[in-house]
């Protein structure tokens, strides 16, 4: 049996892990670290919550991801991004969501994490001081891809779900994605998968796309090696596959000289959104590669205005 003193110590440790840490910088906000938004394989899925002093009632999920790897080591760098600071300055509560990472998790498992975060945030909206029906999402590179998959493939509310938290919708109301992958079957050029593209550039990304299927014959998960089956995975996990007219408004920001995630990915996605009647824009970063430093002229305004327009109803 755990003693009273041991219990008190455990509670103190748990509270310390999620305590609000005042930020000494220019933007006035508090940071709550290591909030558990869900579980996977017995492990907690974590996020940090950044609450500005003057909240505007809306929230933006920042998908912490690069190369389908997510770690809190990236958060200090992310908090220095002008776009991140701008969200806080404008009163948005920012949820820095970390997902399961490759090589431990492959993409089919990774995409299941973001909806859990949305449901947790929406279910606890009052606790976070926001309106649960005014949620946006943003991310860069693989974070942008996961943000778009969430925007297009997330499910609505299921009133018959066993758990109350699963009865709320995992859909968001707006998305902004920086240089995202969108079509993993035709990545840069037709009939070239995302993995083939990465391999052609000497990039090691196999673990992300190491797909497996359950085999009743062997009673274990077997690696998918058949080309047609692999293409089905790529297709089903591509954001472009799931575009429908009821998707949230999407802004894509992409560099024309991006060799890692070709500019074509942003173009084809925005074209299909337009065809489906989904409000969308493509901010063209002329001459820019896969990421850049100082924001371009009009970039930060486009980023903030998108969320203001669709989450705050500002014209």
Model-predicted segments: where are they?
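N-terminal cap/lid segment of alpha/beta-hydrolase-fold proteins
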Residues: 25-55, 106
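Mobile cap/lid helix-loop segments that gate and shape the active-site cleft of serine hydrolases
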Residues: 29, 40, 73, 151, ...
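Short beta-strand element of the alpha/beta-hydrolase
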Residues: 57-67
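Primarily recognizes the serine-hydrolase "nucleophile elbow" in alpha/beta-hydrolase
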Residues: 69, 119-194
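Short amphipathic alpha-helix adjacent to the substrate-entry channel of hydrolases
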Residues: 74-95
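Alpha/beta-hydrolase active-site loop
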Residues: 105-126, 301
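Short beta-strand/loop motif that positions the catalytic acidic residue
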Residues: 246, 252-254, 258
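Catalytic histidine-centered segment of alpha/beta-hydrolase-like enzymes
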Residues: 288-297
């Amino acid at each position: 049996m755990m003693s009273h003193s041991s219990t008190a110590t455990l509670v103190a440790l748990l509270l310390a892990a999620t305590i609000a840490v005042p930020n000494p910088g220019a933007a006035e906000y508090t940071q709550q670290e290591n909030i558990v938004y869900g579980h996977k394989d017995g492990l907690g899925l974590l996020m940090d919550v950044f609450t500005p002093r003057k909240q505007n009632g809306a929230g933006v999920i920042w998908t912490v991801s690069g190369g389908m790897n997510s770690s809190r080591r990236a958060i200090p760098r992310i908090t220095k991004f002008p776009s991140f600071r701008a969200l806080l300055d404008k009163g948005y509560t920012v949820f820095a969501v970390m997902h399961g990472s490759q090589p431990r998790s492959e993409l089919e498992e990774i995409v299941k994490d973001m909806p859990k975060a949305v449901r947790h945030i929406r279910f606890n909206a009052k606790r976070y001081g926001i309106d649960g029906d005014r949620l946006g999402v943003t991310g860069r590179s693989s974070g942008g891809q996961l943000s778009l998959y969430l925007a297009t493939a997330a499910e609505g509310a299921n009133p018959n779900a066993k758990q109350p938290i699963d009865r709320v919708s995992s859909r968001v109301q707006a998305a902004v994605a920086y240089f995202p992958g969108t079509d993993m079957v035709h990545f840069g050029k037709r009939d070239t998968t995302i993995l083939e593209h990465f391999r052609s550039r000497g990039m090691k990304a196999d673990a992300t796309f190491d797909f497996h299927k359950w085999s009743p014959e062997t009673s274990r998960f077997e690696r998918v090696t058949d080309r047609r089956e692999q293409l089905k995975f790529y297709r089903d996990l591509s954001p472009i596959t799931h575009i429908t007219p009821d998707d949230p408004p999407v802004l894509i920001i992409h560099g024309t000289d991006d060799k890692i995630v070709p500019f074509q990915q942003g173009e084809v996605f925005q074209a299909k959104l337009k065809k489906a009647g989904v409000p969308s824009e493509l901010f063209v970063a002329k001459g820019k590669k896969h990421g850049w430093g100082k924001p371009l002229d009009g970039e930060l305004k486009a980023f903030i205005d998108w969320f203001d327009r669709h989450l705050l109803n500002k014209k």
